[in-house]
Amino acid sequence: MPRTEFPACLIRPREGFYTSEVQAPVGWPLRTFLPTGYEPNYPYPLVVFLHGHGGSDEQVLRLAPRLSRRNYVCISLRGPHAVGVRPDGRPAFSWGGDDSQVEDYVLRAIEDTRRRYHVHSERIYLAGFREGAGLAYRLGLLYPERFGGVASLNGALPRGGPLLRLPDVRRLRVLIGHGIANAVAPLSLARADFRLLYTAGLAVRMRTYPTNHRIHPEMLRDIDRWIMDRINEEV
């Protein structure tokens, strides 16, 4: 597998946002947020942000400092399908349907990040927003051995095909965060997802928020608490 070339500024990593590429098989963007006081000897949890329909990698990675400025290495990826422009005039993207190239892109991006930074192999979390939540679910349930958990924010499980690899998926932790006024993915869908995953034996937690399909600030705080609770349980 070809090795991704990183800019020289990453040789001595400092807090901030960085951009590189993943060859999967062409150059796809990989955006990275490094925490304050990044310590190369500490194995950081990795949070992988997957944007919603009409979003972008650049847009969603802005949320990383609001999740935590210290606790995580964060990356964000870009859906391969252009879907016009956002209200701010910047390009908008979508993940599209079931695409093995997208899966390869995400998995390669994680491996590239692990080669460059000190990431804990059992603390890799997928955080999907709206459409990106469906991709996060799909990856987490197909490859439960690769991930510590999946956070679905205002999204839903993919329908129309088997996903649960019992009993393997029972090791996967899931956090569902959903707006009570979400008309795009109704709250009833999230509740049905919760029941399905709980019945399958997964450690699933659900929170609701006074919002529609947009991200509520408390969602990010709950993701931080959810991940840190798990880390504290392991200590």
Please report, for each region that a protein language model flagged, where it lies by residue.
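A domain-start/cap signature at the N-terminus of enzymes
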Residues: M1-L46, G55, R191-R195, V204, ...
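Short substrate-entry loop that stabilizes the transition state in hydrolases
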Residues: Y38-Y44, F49-V85
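Conserved alpha/beta-hydrolase "nucleophile elbow" surrounding the catalytic nucleophile
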Residues: H51, A127-F129, G179
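Short, surface-exposed alpha-helical segments at coil->helix boundaries
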Residues: L61, E103, L107, P186-F194
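Cap/lid segment of the alpha/beta-hydrolase catalytic domain
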Residues: G79-Q101
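Alpha/beta-hydrolase active-site loop
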Residues: W95-Y117
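Primarily recognizes the serine-hydrolase "nucleophile elbow" in alpha/beta-hydrolase
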Residues: E122-R170
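The feature captures the conserved acid-bearing segment of alpha/beta-hydrolase catalytic domains
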Residues: G149, G155-N232
